[in-house]
Amino acid sequence: MRRVTGTLLAVLALCGAVAAAITMGSAHAGARAKPVKLTVWVGWSARELREFKGVVAEYDAKHPEVQIKVVGSINDTKITNAIRSGNPPDVVSSFTSANVGVYCGTGAWIDLAPFLKKDKIDLSQFPKTSLYYTQYKGKRCALPLLADSYGLYYNKAMFAKAGIKSPPKTFTELTADAKKLTQRSGGKLKVAGYDPFWGEYSGNVADMTNYSPLFAAKYLDSKGKAILASQFAWSKLLRWQKKLVDWYGYDKLVRFQAGFGDEFSGSNAFEVGKLAMMMDGEWRVAFLAAEHPELKYGTAPMPVDDAHPELYGAGSVNGTIIGIPKGGKNPDQAWALVKYLTTDNHALARFSNGIRNVPSTRSSAKSKDLKPDKNFATFLKIFNNPHSTTAPITAAGNANLTLVGRFTVKWQAGKVKNLHNGLKALDKQIDAQNAQAGGGGPP
């Protein structure tokens, strides 16, 4: 999965004009004389797309009644534009689970309840967090297709050279280790022990979702109201982050990051030794194996707030969601494929082995087909930790998080003079956005 930003609500609002003209197919598959051609849109590309196509090819070979075409490098904008035009593919998937509130709330993805009921799908096979980010207000328009959890990657050689014997467990330890591991040359950064910069790769996505479970921080209360200003955890996190940015020097950090390679390439800053530690998703294990198998590294849960040692082992969780778009011409055949991809142990284990994402059902996580890997095992544990959390699902989709990201970028640049007042203003913006979108959502 890849984190992307942007808002879908304005685009999907335009779909209403065609909604009445489109009728959802029944949950009863009909016999067809000729193979039904299914088109599947996914966000994966390159190596990961090849792995997905391999999984689909197995299904295709066993089901002569369908012929499946997989299209990669798809994003949410392309999906919503296709739905709006009335010519969507048969199956769609998205890396942005936070947008499920928009997809379910607007009806852009159809309700899967009739299919789930017909085939007696036991939803308890999916962990609680995955069930949460594939529905909105009880309407389930998606299912999880593998999952992501975030943890700490660290360079073992750099740790040994700095005399650090084990990965940090608290943010105080993380700060101390980051400073020990940092290397400078001629006043410029050569190696950053830990880069806290909001927007630096997926781990430090600016909306802070990957840090919220580490500080027991919540975005919304039980009524769906934003509470960033009233929760001390957010101020504590932001002040920690700004202090470490200032220690490096904001301008120096910006110049240093200008030399980073693309996140999803062999030039990734951690992979080439420019970062000693980094928060990242489990997929990095596969990238490292393919691009830098010689690198000696370790994985661990992310450190946690010193005041909450009980949270150690938890982390941020999200994942790819898959569903059937409104207006799809073959919903029954599309559902059969979605069901296979999301519930078949072999399919999930094979795909997990290929791209090293977390299997999204309890049984597939224990499948004999799943290849063991000690670095990957860290993320399986994080995914199943009861304190792990995901982003809040609201009618506004990812738009709330976009607002948060804009604020944190200003904060780290020193453009927010009063943190509490700034967070209060942010809360008002989020509440207004949710109200306009049709209501808030549970935290």
Give, region by region, the residue ranges found by the protein language model.
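Extracytoplasmic/periplasmic substrate-recognition and gating elements
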Residues: 61, 162, 247, 289-356
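Long, aromatic- and glycine/proline-rich binding clefts that accommodate carbohydrate-like moieties
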Residues: 129, 293, 352-406, 410, ...
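Extracytoplasmic/periplasmic solute-binding protein
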Residues: 141-145, 150, 175-227, 233
